């Protein structure tokens, strides 16, 4: 895992390496309830990679879970994302601003992962 700090309220954990094992370890620490979903996704990605003889499903798995970890390791960022998703799902307001902020959160997370 690479070292990274954001001051006194920095990330819960450093950003892990972009490998299935490192991502699983990170998810176990920051969102243990999501480990079954990660395991299922990895199984499906591995099966699809074998069937299609392509690494694309495994790359998609790593991308998806790396972004998840990059968001969830920052509790304030994760809470804000969930709040924005609730606003969009509720459909009570124009979702444009919330969608733009969600996009920004995801782009920041992708940049942190190097993807």
Identify the residue ranges that each predicted region occupies.
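Amphipathic alpha-helical binding modules
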Residues: 78-115
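Intrinsic-disorder/low-complexity, polar/charged segments
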Residues: 18-23, 74, 90, 110-111
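Structured catalytic/translocation cores of nucleotide/phosphate-coupled proteins
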Residues: 1-6, 111-115
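Short terminal alpha-helical segments
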Residues: 2-44
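Generic alpha-helical secondary structure signal
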Residues: 21, 33-36, 56-59, 75, ...
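Charge-rich, solvent-exposed alpha-helical interaction surfaces
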Residues: 26, 41, 45, 61, ...
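Intrinsic-disorder-associated interaction segments
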Residues: 12, 16, 31, 51, ...
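Amphipathic alpha-helical interaction modules
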Residues: 34-74
């Amino acid at each position: 895992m690479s070292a990274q700090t954001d001051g006194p309220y920095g990330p819960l954990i450093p950003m892990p390496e972009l490998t299935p094992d490192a991502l699983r370890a990170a998810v176990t620490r920051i969102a243990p309830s999501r480990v079954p979903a990660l395991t299922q996704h990895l199984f499906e990605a591995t099966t699809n990679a074998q069937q299609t003889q392509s690494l694309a499903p495994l790359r998609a798995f790593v991308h998806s879970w790396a972004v998840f970890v990059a968001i969830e390791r920052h509790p304030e960022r994760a809470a804000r994302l969930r709040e924005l998703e609730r606003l969009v799902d509720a459909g009570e307001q124009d979702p444009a601003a919330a969608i733009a902020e969600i996009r920004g959160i995801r782009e920041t997370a992708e940049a942190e992962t190097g993807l």
